[in-house]
A protein has these predicted regions:
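Glycine-rich ThDP/TPP pyrophosphate-binding loop and its adjacent helix/strand module
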Residues: 1-121
Length: 121
């Protein structure tokens, strides 16, 4: 919440790192339609935070790099804002609003695990 963001910036809590999963989907639509999140980085900066924006939050190497930068940054808390694709790597889930709150069937679970294992090979 904003009070927490303000307090962390005010007290220069440089051992604090917040991660925002910016997949642009929420239960009732896209964030652009329902509640725009375009200015999140600005809001964090306005409250005294260091901000690291990750272009592909589904790329583990980019996330590791961001967290290494956050750990090295002194004097401010850090917000890592990672642009992601909800359900990345699972064909029937990828970028689908319905999976913000969906429950898989056993068959869907097996298919998802299969696709993710194949992607790791």
């Amino acid at each position: 919440n904003y009070e927490g963001m303000m307090a962390a910036g005010h007290y220069k809590l440089d051992n604090l790192c917040a991660t925002v999963d910016l997949n642009r989907l929420q239960i009732s639509g896209t964030t652009g339609q329902v509640m725009d999140s375009a200015s999140l980085a600005e809001k964090f900066r306005d409250f005294g935070w260091n901000v690291i924006e990750v272009l592909d939050g589904n790329d583990c190497a980019q996330l590791v790099n961001a967290y290494e930068q956050a750990a090295a940054y002194k004097g401010k808390p850090t917000a890592v804002i990672a642009s992601t694709v909800k359900g990345k790597g699972v064909s029937f889930m990828e970028n689908q609003i319905s999976w913000h709150h969906g429950v898989m069937t056993e068959e869907q679970y097996e298919q998802a695990v299969k696709e993710l294992k194949e992607a790791l090979q």
